[in-house]
Amino acid sequence: MGGDNAPACVVEGVIDALRESGNRFEILLIGQEEKVAPLLQQYDTGALKLRFVHAPEVITMEDVPATAVKAKQESSLVRGLKLCKAKDADAFVSAGNTGAMMAASLFVLGRIPGVLRPTIYAYFPRLGEGLTNLVDVGANVDCKPENLVQFAEMLTIYQRYAAKIEQPVVGLLNIGEEEGKGPDYLKQAWKMLQKAHEEQKINFIGNIEGHDILAGKATIVVCDGLVGNTILKFGESIPHFLGAIFKPALEKLVKEGKLDQNSAVLAGQTFKGIFEPFDVEKFGGVPFLGVDGISIVGHGRSSARAIKNMIYMAEHMIEQRVNERIAKMLA
């Protein structure tokens, strides 16, 4: 029941998912009864496949992840993952503390056999259709070459079956396209990725550079978590930055008589449309790839729409047996 807008937006998202889907799955809503019960009373839930599970403790955004997971065993986060571990639930979704989600997922669910380190990716828009996934974006700051290879392999499985990308394309983020570029660990990763390509596990096109991410040269861009998280946070700042300078510039043109009000409104609408590809709420969240269960985390500011779409993502991963396919590939 985490997130900046919880629990109201979580309850709304759950209700929307059940109604929109025609009740094709059951949802266990986990949280503090005294806060959730009044919200549920606002909806007609009688015909919905919805059960409530009381969890008295809360892991906040300020909590130290590993410490909080151990100390707050009765939190919605830990209780939800334990339900998955016990096979009483098939997936867990939350917009709570990402670090705590990652720590709890690994602690409670463990790793898929053969996985060295679970990972997390991010969405980036690209020229043309579709999206680019950047992996890793903070789960693994210090990576070995073999970690980068597994990230590419796991995300290839996810894209192929869950995202319906027929032929995912893997690029290794580096300071140049040539094979011998970059530090030793990237040179080794290149060789190992090329071997995986030859074994037909992935479709590896070699090194790519930063400008290739938005250009759409690859559907999967592999890097360590430090680089990935830095790029992610920079990318998240772009719409806000451009919006902050665009609005005053537009107002100045109107004030100077160089642009009429109607044209300014149209320009503003066009500007908003440009950044529609940056809207990740259409996907809801991202799964932790490599943990032995389905654990999906959304942005802390997730809306009801994002919660609903995270639920659909979980359903799709279950149907496509993504984790089973990852385990089979790594066996």
From Swiss-Prot:
It is found in: Cytoplasm. GO terms for biological process: fatty acid biosynthetic process; phospholipid biosynthetic process. It is an enzyme of class 2 (transferase). GO terms for cellular component: cytoplasm. It comes from the Bacteria. Signal peptide: none annotated. InterPro entries: FA_synthesis, Phospholipid_synth_PlsX-like. GO terms for molecular function: phosphate:acyl-[acyl carrier protein] acyltransferase activity. Catalyzes the reversible formation of acyl-phosphate (acyl-PO(4)) from acyl-[acyl-carrier-protein] (acyl-ACP). This enzyme utilizes acyl-ACP as fatty acyl donor, but not acyl-CoA. HAMAP family: PlsX. Homodimer. Probably interacts with PlsY. This is Phosphate acyltransferase.
